[in-house]
Swiss-Prot record:
Belongs to the peptidase S26 family. IMP1 subfamily. Catalyzes the removal of transit peptides required for the targeting of proteins from the mitochondrial matrix, across the inner membrane, into the inter-membrane space. Known to process the nuclear encoded protein DIABLO. Its EC number is 3.4.21.-. InterPro entries: LexA/Signal_pep-like_sf, Mito_IMP1_subunit, Pept_S26A_signal_pept_1, Peptidase_S26. Disulfide bonds: none annotated. It is an enzyme of class 3 (hydrolase). GO terms for cellular component: mitochondrial inner membrane; mitochondrion. One of its GO terms (biological process) is signal peptide processing. Keywords: Hydrolase, Membrane, Mitochondrion, Mitochondrion inner membrane, Protease. It comes from the Eukaryota. This is Mitochondrial inner membrane protease subunit 1. Pfam families: Peptidase_S26.
Amino acid sequence: MLRGVLGKAFRLAGYTIQYGCIAHCAFEYVGGVVMCSGPSMEPTIQNSDIVFAENLSRHFYGIQRGDIVIAKSPSDPKSNICKRVIGLEGDKILSTSPSDVFKSRSYVPTGHVWLEGDNLQNSTDSRYYGPIPYGLIRGRIFFKIWPFSDFGFLRDSPNGQRFSDD
């Protein structure tokens, strides 16, 4: 009897570990559901919107200008940020201060990206901490799940592209 109980317990533990490994790989390498907080991506993503982030692009297809990404915060590695890719390595970016008074040109070095929020007046982004390493990108957001009234693919940036001509 003890043998049967131990056998079932070990089988259950084995299945639990297997399913846990599968779930971990799915969330780490395929994608998952993310709740975005803060006003920096308004009007595209509102505070507490739930979105789907896929992780395959950063490994296989690459991140493109205009993509919305989840990345580790350069100023607080324990938290994630949700921002739009404005520039890729080698790009020259024309950025403005939050007050729209000062304009500056920035160069994105190799292995880095330039991220900004869609709500430029209320976003802490690459204008403050500079280009971020590509390795900090966790995934690409492309689909809004909640609220149901906004269910669907995300739209382009309301700010347009801001690249320097020289």
